[in-house]
Amino acid sequence: MDDAPRLVFYFDYVDPGSYLMHRQLGQLLPDGVEATVHPLEVRPVPQELIDGMDPDWTAYGRTVEGLAREAEIRMAHPTFVPWSRKAHELRLHAAEQGLESPMHAEIFSAHFQEGADIGRIDILVAAAERVGLDASESKAVLDVDKHRDRVVDL
């Protein structure tokens, strides 16, 4: 049994606070403490998408952006907030291929640095290719909802 301390981090790829935590996690963890990440959809399908211009959402984003600036982390405030289930599914696929960490970082970067719509399969497949995953296999995995239940159940 592994007795190493473990931090469990629930996150969503469209949540500004999750992005900031992702960027700072390595620096914040004491030696010997590992982090486990679990998907948590802010707005799961079929709920309405978050209105990226909603005053409460915008205020939250601006607060996180201020904290990011203090930490010298560049961060955009995307005005479109897509559903994120497919992005979570792609991370789980990447984990099976030994590429979870780079895929996790790439998805966050695509949304919060490039402003990409990470709810689109073509955008996610391009991100998968950038980290070394096979495009056809990644698209097939996303098309058939292979990891849907794992995202919903986690």
Model segments located where?
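C-terminal cap of thioredoxin/glutaredoxin-like
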Residues: 2-33, 37, 106-154
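Structural alpha/beta surface segment adjacent to cysteine/selenocysteine redox centers
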Residues: 17-114
